[in-house]
């Protein structure tokens, strides 16, 4: 009897152990692993998955589900596994509500993104590493053909503390939209970044999900963009160097038009048209074809294209002479880059190098063109999110070197604006002066006469202004709705707290007066809300807790971009929140922003 009892006791222990083993297996495999990766699709890479497809031909599906190894979560990419589905409706990559905030974690990531990167990292992470962008080329570009013997390209991307998702979207756009036989390599130069995800995680990602032609070089100390690009170029072995910023997305057929011009003349440097990626919404939009210029403060500026450069049967697709380049995106024969003296290594970090190389190209026998059929999108930030390592004014230092080497007597134009800099140190320029002599370069007067005759000169060398530009002015956006912005529950209207013409003024709820034109809002195709046809409803992108204000319409979307969504909510695109009445029982009628929840405090209608 005792042996039977012991035997059944042992059976019970074995059964219990097996049961617990199965339960623990289910718990750990389906709770701890699957749950954080719930947005990883079974095939390919959906809009929310942290792991994109492996290197597959475009429009094909990727591998099966990836569970191991998981990348470590950290402060800069902790949204990569976040569920961003709207409770009411799934959000696609093209959704205007892709930046919607659902919880405090979303809000923290959005605010951190603006602080660290000066753009909306919440949306950037949700977009993933692959997305289609609109083909913004002129229709005539789409029928053009290019030689079959184009040179190969080394794409050099220098980055410092870049957002992980933005950097990888840059790289994937190049891989996805560049013929493999033309893309010799992509060289990523890490300029001693501080963020953890740009070190081991980036290396592991590249090894697992990108072709072997993608390489990373790591600077041991901060060198800056200028010397960082020189380091990348020194490692390159392709026939052409293509420099890109680390927050770009190349468009279709972007590389062939650049390479074709360089094949024809290796001493020609070419730039794509730089399309706009909004820092607030990451929406990709077309830019007009303009050319580079500068002012006597030695700052780059965009100019309209002279009438003389717009003629000809191929005017929509023909290369456009540009006195200067913006500097972030350009292509150049690698041997010519070295022969021409690369960059001035005495310049620090960033600033002025684009004008210096532009002057050197033109004055020393080369040419600089913008190619209308090549388009690359670039995130245009309103500020630089980081400074120089020791806080030095590198723009001034670099501009002084530029002025003393290349401007000849015209450097006095610069010093007339900055007399305080005449005695400021700028380092040893003897090598650059010797380079100019060795290359047999023209004078700066030759440059002004032959390349940039539109540039105005003050003093005894002043010239008459040449009215050679066409400026038709901006097209006014089409009006979609006109009426009063009515709050459904309080039966009141949103109006200016003071005068509707007061810039920076607050808005609040008051009794609707259908005879008062200052209560009338216009909603146009640019998604702007304009009160009394004067000022736009605007939100601070960096301080989402601030109330909305009336500001001058800037036409750039972002802080002034509003959409009417389901449940009558009024959604602010760059902030990712909805307009609400702060306290519906309070007679003061204050309004603010809050996480969109469809509550009665967030219900609005624009009606006549």
From Swiss-Prot:
Membrane topology note: Single-pass type II membrane protein
Protein name: Polypeptide N-acetylgalactosaminyltransferase 11
PROSITE patterns, per the entry: RICIN_B_LECTIN
Pathway listed: Protein modification; protein glycosylation
Broad enzyme group: transferase
Lumenal side, ranges: 30-608
Subcellular location per the Swiss-Prot or TrEMBL entry: Golgi apparatus membrane
PANTHER family: N-ACETYLGALACTOSAMINYLTRANSFERASE, POLYPEPTIDE N-ACETYLGALACTOSAMINYLTRANSFERASE 11
Location of region: Catalytic subdomain A: 150-261
Listed SUPFAM superfamilies: Nucleotide-diphospho-sugar transferases, Ricin B-like lectins
Transmembrane segments: 7-29
Keyword Transport part of the UniProt annotation: no
